[in-house]
Amino acid sequence: MSSNKKRRIDEKPMSALSALQARRREAAASPVQTTQTGSESDEKSVTTSVNPYQLLRKDSSQSTAPKTPKKNVVKDQYLPRGAESPASRSRGVVIASGNTDTLNPELAGASQKVVREYSSFRLSKQNHRVKTGGVVELNLSNSERFLVLGSFGIRVIQGEVSLAGATLYPSETIEWVHAPHCHAVPMLRTIDETILELHPDRNARGIRQLGRLSPLFRKIWNESPETNSSKTSKESTFEIIYTSEDAPKKCIIQKLVSPPEWNKKLSSLVATSRKKPSLSTLICGPKSAGKSTFSRLFLNGLLTDRSQKQGARSVVILDLDPGQPEYAPPGTLSLVFVTKPNLGTPFTHPSLKNSAFTVVRSHSMASATPAPNPDLYLACATDLFDTYSKHYSGAPLIVNTPGWIQGTGLDLLSSLIEKIKPQEVLYMSEAGPDEAVNALRAATKLMFTELPSQPSEFTSRTAAHLRAMQTMSYFHLQNTALKTSNLLDTSTRLKWDASPLSSRAPLLVQYSSSKRGVLGLLSYDYQCSPELLADTVNGLVLAAVEIEDRKAFSNFPQEVAPPPLVSTSPENIPFIPNYDDVALDPRYSRTIGLVLLRGIDTKSETLQLVTPIPLEEFRSIKSQGRSIVLLHGKFDTPNWAYTEELYERAGTEEGNDMVLEVTEEDTEDDQSGVEPEGADGVSDLTEVPWVEVLKGSQRRPVGSQVWRPLRHLGRNNTGD
C-alpha cells in the first residue's frame, strides 16, 4: 500500500459541514482583486477569483492520476482565446500569447484563469484611427507599452518610441520590424504625447507563405488574416497583443527582456562610444546565454544614439558564430557594415546586401562549428579583423562569438582576444565555469566584465531548426525595391519567392569546356574518391568562393607553381584534390554566397545550381579573369529543400493547425535527421530523390543516424 493511500485511511474523518466551512474560509482568504506580480514593474498578472462554492466543484484533472508534463511544459499555459468587444480591438492589429504565473497554492484545484497583460492600453476611437492601406495611427497621450506580433513598419510622427534597444524619433523614414513568436518579441514603449504609425508590410507576404513549403515556418506569426472578415484585417500583417488570452493557439510568447545589469552596461557602453567612436567590444559566453540578444540591443543603442552625429551612425559587426550568424547564411563568418537598427530575426535578413547593412567580406567554414578546422577559423577571423582595421577602424566594432567555451573552444576565444585586443570583453554568465573565466580574463589586456545570462525558458525551434529556417529563407530571397504609400522609401528591401526551389529554372554552369563556369569542386574535412564525387555533392549546399589571387592555393601541395592541380571524376567534373585536408588562404579568397546543387546533367556536362547570387556577380568575377570554386564540407543537409513541393502539393497551407512541439531552450539540437511534424500528410504523394518514405510505425534501423565526433577535445590532445 502506498504512503498516499495510508494517509487517506488514517486521516481523521471530517463532516461535510466542516469541510464546507473550511473551503469557504479558504476561498474567502483568496485574492478577489487584480494583483500585480512579475519581475518587471510594467508587467501585470491578473487573477480572476471565483465564487466560494466553486472550490467544491470536481476537477476532472483531480480524479485521475497526475501526469508528468513533457519537457516541463504545463498544459495550463495554453489558455483559451478570450472574446473581445469590437470597440476595444482593431481588426488586423494584434495578438500574442504569454506564460502563466504560478497559481496560488491556497487555491490549488480551483477553476482559475491567469491572464498576463502585454499592453497598457486598449485601442479606442480617441487614441487611434485606420488610414488608407491598413495604416494604423496611434495617438497616445501618456507613456504606454504594447506588444505587436507580425511584420510591420513603424514611423514616429511625434514623441519617441523605443524597442529592442533602439530609440526612434520623428522621421519620414519607416523602420521595418519582423516579430515572430518563435523568437523573443520586443515590447514597444512610448513617452508622453507620442503619435506613431504602424504600416502593414507587403514584402512579408513571401516569407509568411514559406509555411506552405515547410512546417518550420508555420504558426509563428499573427493570426492568419483570412480568419477575420473585415477589410482592414485582410490588409494587415500584424496584430497588437493585449493579454495572453489574445494569443494564437498553442504558442508561448516571450518578451524580449533586458535585465537591469544589462541596461546599466548598455548605457555605459553607449556613453563610452561618444568619447571613443572606435570602441571595440567582444561578447562571449556559453550557448543560449543571450550573446546575440545583447549584441542586438547594443547595436541598436549605438545606431540610434541621438548625441552622435547624423553622418557617423554606423557600426561594424564581426560575426564569428558560424552556427547562428546574425546576417550572413549559416556556415559563414562575416564582417558586416550596419547603418540601420536590427529590428528583425536572423531568418528575416539572411542576404549579403540590404538597405540596412552590407556584408563587406565573408568566409565559409563549410560547417556550423569551428571544430573541424580551428586553424582555418582563426585565419578567417584574422583576415576579417584586418579588413576592419584597414577600412573601418573609425567605427564601433562588436564581435560576436560562438558558445564553445571549453577545450578547443576556449583556446580559440583566448586567441581571438589576444589578436583583436578589444577595449572590453563581456562574458555572458556569472556561473563560470571558472576555468573558462580565468583563462579569458588572463587573455584580456583591458576590461573584462561578467554579466548575468538571459536564456529562454522555452522555444518552439531548436538551433538546428533556426539554421534550417535561415538557410531556407536565404535560398528563397529575391531583391526588389519597394515604395510604400506616399512616403519616400525606395531603398532596396528583401523579398521572398515562396515557390518551391524545384519549380525554378536552375542556373546551368558548364564544367567540362575550356571556358567552364567554375574552376572545380573543393572538399573540406574529407576527400572522397573520384568515383563517388558526383553522388557525394549532388543535392547539397555548397559555398561559392571567389579566388582573388592564385596565392589562395599556397597551402596546397604543388609540384609546380599555380594554377593548382585540377583532376576530373568519371563524369568529367573538375575537382581540386585535398587529401591532406588543407584550406584556401582567406587573405586571397572570399565567399560570395551559397548555392544548392540541384542536379548534375552528365550528357550536357552542366551543373544545375539554385542560388540567390545575382548572375551579374558571376559575370563580373569572370570578366576580371578570376575563378570560382564550389566548396563542399559539412553544411547541414537541406532536408527542407527535398520536401517543399510535397508539402505544397499536399495543400498544407500556412493557416493549418500543425505546429512544432514546444521544448526547453537547451534541447539537444543534433536532430537533423528527424522528420518535421506533418510529414505524414505528404508521404504517399510520389517518390522524391533523397526522401525516405516511412509508413505507419516504421522506423529507421539502429545505426542509421549520422555519427559525429566529440567537440570538446583539446586542440593539443595527442590521444595518449
UniProtKB/Swiss-Prot annotation:
Q: Which family does it belong to?
A: Belongs to the Clp1 family. NOL9/GRC3 subfamily.
Q: Which InterPro entries match?
A: Clp1/Grc3 (IPR045116), CLP1_P (IPR032319), P-loop_NTPase (IPR027417)
Keyword DNA damage in the entry? The reply is no
Q: What is the protein's known function?
A: Polynucleotide 5'-kinase involved in rRNA processing.
What Enzyme Commission number does this protein have?
A: 2.7.1.-
Give the highest taxon in the source lineage. Eukaryota
Q: Write out the biased-composition intervals (Acidic residues).
A: 663-672
Keywords (alphabetical) are:
ATP-binding, Kinase, Nucleotide-binding, Nucleus, rRNA processing, Transferase
> Taxonomic classification, please?
Eukaryota, Fungi, Dikarya, Ascomycota, Pezizomycotina
Is Protein biosynthesis tagged as a keyword? no
Q: Which residues bind ATP?
A: 285-292
A GO CC annotation recorded here is: nucleolus
Any idea what this protein is called?
Answer: Polynucleotide 5'-hydroxyl-kinase GRC3
Q: Mind listing the GO biological process terms from this record?
A: cleavage in ITS2 between 5.8S rRNA and LSU-rRNA of tricistronic rRNA transcript (SSU-rRNA, 5.8S rRNA, LSU-rRNA); rRNA processing
